[in-house]
A protein has these predicted regions:
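BRCT (BRCA1 C-terminal) domain core and associated BRCT-interaction motifs
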Residues: 1-44, 88-177
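Conserved, structured regulatory domains from eukaryotic proteins
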Residues: 17, 24-80
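Short hydrophobic beta-strand segments
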Residues: 71-88, 124-126
Length: 177
């Protein structure tokens, strides 16, 4: 597929994967216009606009699509995400979104090798439900590296792919428990 037709801007797996891959995202008027004119119409003239959601999520869909179309499936290229079991949305959904953005995914446990996490391009994603395993991994990492391990919520991926701009600050870090 090269085009996603939508009535509204959402943060669904389908929408995020389309953004990550640099697909055109259009409103329903694109289809109606093509039916009326009986010819293919450039989708760029019918880019979806949802000003309320764009404002809510601090982004502009046309700007985001421009960035993603310049370098499709590249936002997370070279990045590996170690994802704990109880993350929401599910590890499967996050995997598809991350892979659409060019990244890769591994399963994280309390016994994940701390050496692989030392890279600037290795990121851990977890949730409060994984607290025991996260604590074990953080302890292991701190002993090996002398510094704390940042663990992010899934929001780092969802918001980053939505905006086509990653935020590795503490904004999306899982709070210490």
């Amino acid at each position: 597929a090269h085009v996603l037709v939508a009535k509204a801007l959402t943060r669904t797996e389908k929408m995020l994967c389309a953004i990550a891959r640099g697909l055109d995202i259009v409103n329903v008027s694109w289809i109606k216009t093509m039916i009326r004119k009986r010819e293919r119409i450039d989708p760029k003239a019918h880019v979806l606009r949802d000003r309320n959601r764009e404002h809510q999520w601090s982004m502009s869909l046309p700007d985001v699509l421009s960035r993603s179309q310049d370098n499709p499936s590249s936002l997370l290229r070279g990045h590996t995400f170690y994802i704990f079991k109880h993350t929401e949305p599910s590890r499967d959904v996050l995997t598809r979104v991350i892979e659409a953005a060019g990244g890769s995914v591994e399963h994280a446990t309390g016994k994940t090798d701390a050496r692989v996490l030392a890279s600037d391009q290795a990121h851990v994603i977890g949730s409060a439900a994984d607290e025991t395993a996260i604590h074990a991994l953080q302890s292991h990492y701190t002993k090996a590296h002398g510094s704390p391990l940042a663990v992010y919520t899934a929001e780092v991926v969802l918001a980053g792919v939505l905006r086509q701009q990653m935020d590795w600050t503490s904004t999306y870090q899982l709070s210490a428990t």
